Regions:
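Short acidic/polar hinge/loop motifs at secondary-structure boundaries
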Residues: 40-75
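Membrane-embedded beta-barrel scaffold of Gram-negative outer-membrane proteins
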Residues: 108, 241, 251-267, 394, ...
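Extracytoplasmic beta-strand/coil segments of soluble accessory domains associated
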Residues: 2-43
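Face-selective signature of the C-terminal outer-membrane beta-barrel domain
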Residues: 187-205, 227-383, 392-396, 467, ...
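N-terminal periplasmic accessory domains that precede
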Residues: 1, 19-22, 34-36, 58-61, ...
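C-terminal beta-signal and adjacent terminal beta-strands/loops
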Residues: 43-44, 476, 571-580, 606-668
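Gram-negative outer-membrane beta-barrel transporters
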Residues: 107, 362-366, 470-475, 486, ...
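Transmembrane beta-barrel wall of Gram-negative outer-membrane proteins
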Residues: 117-207, 234-236, 303
Length: 668
């Protein structure tokens, strides 16, 4: 998919192996994840560090892969109508639906890495669906998977230089995970084209610890927990969905969803070099409740030209109880005016009320114009208006011109806007201070917004498809840790920083697609992304560390009716590190390290043994092009003890090597 990469929330390299989906360089926090059109927001329960990173796997793994019917990705202006968190784009995971006849499946998958220091995966899942009566049908699926953690010393020999008390520390590899989930759906078609769905889903993800900490340092507790479960995420959703359609062409989609996340993990430090490292062997649980009510109706009508208007409203409420992130002591740094030193509330919440309208107007047989408008009122950040305008123009039988512009937005997180969330640094994390400082939440933050623009030309003839798109996002009010103090403690010794809005940033690039029907049995599909600019205009630094270009290519051959073969290639361009350290000074030495371009190839084959049984086998990373994590992006340490962990630049993640895999799929 063009425009899509994996990256972290910032350029820090912290939690470097917890890469998530990034669309058009806007970062994972601006990628809205939906499951069957409903938001999945469990990652929001994970504490946001000083640099914006979260120790999370994201929200894309709550559905077993074999239960996914398709994945829809919206990019640019088209995503703006989805509101909060969709400034980069939307990933909608569509699950398999109920069936009119009784059907079931049982699937298994395993892989074997060539290198024993890389974690292997085993996975199994099942599904069952069918009718209960003329009007009632059901669907049930579940899965279990286990991925082992990488070896604790997988990056031995590749780490950046480390001295003093850090001499024997290593950046961690990829952590493992045990994933269990089940999903039940009861569908009632109570009248013609009128359906009411009742759904319950439960998921549990527990990690297998690989030794990672926010600053890649260690202690005895870190070492003793390697391979053990140190955090677990429970996600439960209850949903009711009403879909209706009438012979007039009017249709409606309405749902209510309650999502509860319990995020349980070992207690972590909140100060300086100990931020994100285990503080003791006790567990804390953060509870996030997310309630969403959504209603929309689409009405076709003729007023000069055929049109379809969509009108809708949405209500979202988030409530979080987080007893662990409001516990930073003020004994050393001094008291912060207006904030309780010892008894800060663990509760935070936000509400969003939304109205939206969109009109698809068929101006001519070859011209479709789609204006739209969304209004959001956030209980903390206030009002936001998001207008949009998209045009699709056929240029003869072979070409289509597409263009669009929209204002997208993202509200502050419950950590960024919570004044009781306090972090502390003795100096290295303080952008403009010579001594210690605090970072506290800010309830006066504005919502982030982005003016997203694109224009593209597409050629299509039979199964041929070629296209190129230019996109530009003018990003405003991005929320980051402040660059200048806004006050001092009551003793006047410690500066106070807040989360603040950064005035301007720009992301722009090119996307291309080329699909070639080589023959009746061979297809060659390609896409590419080239980043022209990705810059915070206030600091001059990059917004995220992503490849300069990415090219994906897939060659598929249906050799016989029962046998298919596939070859894949992904070519990643150069990845440049951040330009400036936390003090705003130019990076030096190994902090300037780049990741050179590299290519990952894959081969696979699927054979249908019978109409109900198929087997797939293949090799990922055929030529064993591995990448090793050297550390976090920039140098940190203690001049008094001469203990340093030198910066790794862009070398902040692991790319696994050659891996053999096999899957068996059965169905009836």
């Amino acid at each position: 998919m063009p425009g899509v990469n994996l990256t972290g929330n910032s350029t820090s390299g912290q939690r470097g192996n917890n890469r998530q989906i990034d669309i058009r360089g806007m970062g994972p926090e601006n990628t809205l994840i939906l499951i069957d059109g409903k938001p999945a927001s469990s990652r929001n329960s994970v504490r946001q560090g000083w640099r914006g990173e979260r120790d999370t796997r994201g929200d894309t793994a709550w559905v077993p892969p074999d239960m996914i019917e398709r994945i829809e990705v919206l990019r640019g202006p088209a995503a703006a109508r989805y509101g909060n968190g969709a400034a980069g784009g939307v990933v909608n995971i569509i699950t398999k639906k109920t069936t009119q006849d009784l059907h079931g499946s049982l699937n298994g998958y395993f892989n074997v890495p060539q290198h024993k220091d890389e974690g292997a995966t085993k996975r199994t899942d099942f599904s069952l669906s069918g009718p209960l009566s003329d009007q009632l049908s059901f669907r049930l699926f579940g899965g279990y998977s286990k991925t082992q953690a990488d070896a604790w010393d997988i990056n031995q020999g590749h780490q950046s230089e480390r001295t003093g008390t850090y001499a024997n520390t290593l950046p961690a590899g990829r952590e493992g995970v045990i994933d269990k989930n089940i999903d039940a759906l009861l569908s009632w078609e109570f009248a013609h084209l009128q359906t009411l769905d009742f759904q319950y889903a439960y998921g549990r993800q527990g990690n297998l610890y690989a030794g990672d900490t926010q600053n890649t340092n260690t202690n005895a507790l870190v070492q003793s927990n390697y391979g053990k479960e140190t955090n677990r995420m429970y996600r439960e959703t209850y949903a009711v969905n009403y879909r209706g359609a009438w012979d007039s062409g009017v249709s409606t989609n309405n749902y209510v969803q309650f999502e509860r996340t319990r995020n349980t993990r070992l207690a972590e430090g909140l100060a300086g070099g100990t931020e994100g490292i285990f503080a003791n062997d006790s567990y804390n649980t953060t509870r996030l409740d997310d309630f969403t009510a959504h209603s929309e109706v689409s009405i076709p009508f003729d007023m000069w030209v055929p049109q379809t208007a969509t009108l809708g409203t949405e209500w979202n409420q988030q409530k979080m109880k987080d007893p662990s992130s409001t516990t930073q002591s003020m004994t050393e740094g001094g008291l912060i005016p207006g904030i309780d030193a010892t008894n800060r509330s663990p509760y935070s919440s936000a509400k969003i009320f939304s109205l939206f309208a969109e009109n698809n107007a068929e101006l001519t047989d070859s011209t479709m114009l789609t204006p739209g408008l969304r209004f959001d009122h956030h209980s903390e950040a206030g009002d936001n208006w998001s207008p949009s305008l998209n045009l699709s123009q056929e240029l003869g039988d072979l070409f289509t011109l597409k263009m669009g512009i929209a204002r997208a937005y993202k509200a502050p997180t419950l950590f960024q806007s919570n004044g009781n969330y306090v972090l502390y640094s003795r100096g290295q994390g303080c952008a403009a201070s010579g001594g210690a400082c605090y970072l506290i939440g800010n309830d006066d933050l504005k919502a982030e917004n982005s003016i997203n623009k694109e224009i593209g030309l597409e050629f299509h003839h039979d199964d041929w498809l070629a296209g190129i798109t230019y996109f530009r996002n003018d990003y405003r009010n991005k929320i980051e840790a402040g660059y200048a103090p806004t006050g001092t403690t009551t003793n006047g010794k410690t500066d106070i920083y807040r989360w603040e809005n950064v005035p301007k940033a720009v992301v722009q690039g090119l996307e291309g697609t080329l699909n070639v029907p080589v023959s009746e049995t061979v297809a060659w599909n390609n896409n590419a992304t080239y980043m022209i600019e990705n810059e915070n205009k206030t600091t001059g630094d990059y917004l995220s560390i992503i490849p300069e270009f990415t090219i994906n290519s897939t060659l598929s051959w249906q050799a016989t009716q029962d046998l298919s073969l596939q070859g894949t290639m992904t070519w990643y361009g150069r990845q440049k590190p951040k330009k400036y350290n936390y003090k705003g000074e130019p990076v030096t030495g190994t902090e300037k390290r780049e990741v050179s371009p590299y290519t990952v190839f894959g081969l696979s084959s699927t054979y249908a043994v019978t109409k109900n049984v198929s087997i797939t086998g293949g090799i990922d990373n055929l030529f064993d092009k591995r990448q090793f994590r050297a550390g976090n992006a920039q140098t940190t340490g203690n001049a008094v003890t001469n203990s340093y962990m030198y910066g790794a630049g862009a070398a902040t993640y692991n790319e696994p090597g050659r891996t053999y895999f096999m899957s068996l799929n059965t169905q009836f």
